[in-house]
Curated annotation (Swiss-Prot):
Gene3D superfamilies documented for this protein: Cystine-knot cytokines (2.10.90.10)
Signal peptide: 1-28
Residue stretches making up the CTCK domain: 82-172
Role, per record: Negative regulator of bone growth that acts through inhibition of Wnt signaling and bone formation.
GO molecular function, one term: DNA-binding transcription factor binding
Family indicated by similarity: Belongs to the sclerostin family.
GO biological process: BMP signaling pathway; canonical Wnt signaling pathway; cellular response to parathyroid hormone stimulus; negative regulation of BMP signaling pathway; negative regulation of canonical Wnt signaling pathway; negative regulation of ossification; negative regulation of protein-containing complex assembly; negative regulation of Wnt signaling pathway
Keywords: Disulfide bond, Glycoprotein, Heparin-binding, Secreted, Signal, Wnt signaling pathway
Superkingdom to which the source organism belongs: Eukaryota
Compositionally skewed regions (Basic residues) per UniProt: 190-201
Subcellular location: Secreted
Organism: Rattus norvegicus
Reported induction: Down-regulated by parathyroid hormone (PTH).
Name of the protein: Sclerostin
Length: 213
């Protein structure tokens, strides 16, 4: 008889526990490790941290803050890469005793923040605007000593070397040669001479072509 009463007492205790839970609601159960079980008729409210979070990856700013240092709307600096070139100065059979070093300006301009040894920085206002080319900016004069073969006396010569480079803005109009008229009528007439009419010369050329076989 004692064995049959034990399961009955266990069932009564479980039933009493469920009745107490239904009277108090599901919020009485709380999982301290991960989450809180909400009520059956109530929806969980999103935490305020997610609503006020400004560092989320959004489509309108590409996952970056609104004021990003590399924003395309900001003014960025463009400059040339500094390339040193060493060569000897020659004048016929004579050659300089020591090589000279100068800068070589070639290639396109790049962002100054990506070029640690950049020179000749300029402001670039539009990212999709005109193209920039690296060209010589300033020159310096240097006198070198030339040594000639055959026991001739050494002589000196003054050479011109590139001292700095700069970025020159080239627009699309520079490459549109079809828009420019290179005809003879656009040339300026020389002083002291009257411009020759073009129609007369055209008739003379036409007569020569007719007589040619």
């Amino acid at each position: 008889m004692q064995l049959s009463l034990a399961p009955c007492l266990a069932c009564l205790l479980v039933h009493a526990a469920f009745v107490a839970v239904e009277s108090q609601g599901w919020q009485a159960f709380k999982n301290d490790a991960t989450e809180i079980i909400p009520g059956l008729r109530e929806y969980p409210e999103p935490p305020q941290e997610l609503e006020n979070n400004q560092t989320m990856n959004r489509a309108e700013n590409g996952g970056r803050p609104p004021h990003h240092p590399y924003d395309t709307k900001d003014v960025s600096e463009y400059s040339c890469r500094e390339l040193h070139y060493t060569r000897f100065v020659t004048d016929g059979p004579c050659r300089s005793a020591k090589p000279v070093t100068e800068l070589v300006c070639s290639g396109q301009c790049g962002p100054a923040r990506l070029l640690p040894n950049a020179i000749g920085r300029v402001k670039w206002w539009r990212p999709n605007g005109p193209d920039f080319r690296c060209i010589p900016d300033r020159y310096r004069a240097q006198r070198v000593q030339l040594l000639c073969p055959g026991g001739a006396a050494p002589r000196s010569r003054k050479v011109r070397l590139v001292a700095s480079c700069k970025c020159k803005r080239l627009t699309r109009f520079h490459n549109q040669s079809e828009l420019k008229d290179f005809g003879p009528e656009t040339a300026r007439p020389q002083k002291g001479r009257k411009p020759r009419p073009r129609a007369r010369g055209a008739k003379a050329n036409q007569a020569e072509l007719e007589n040619a076989y």
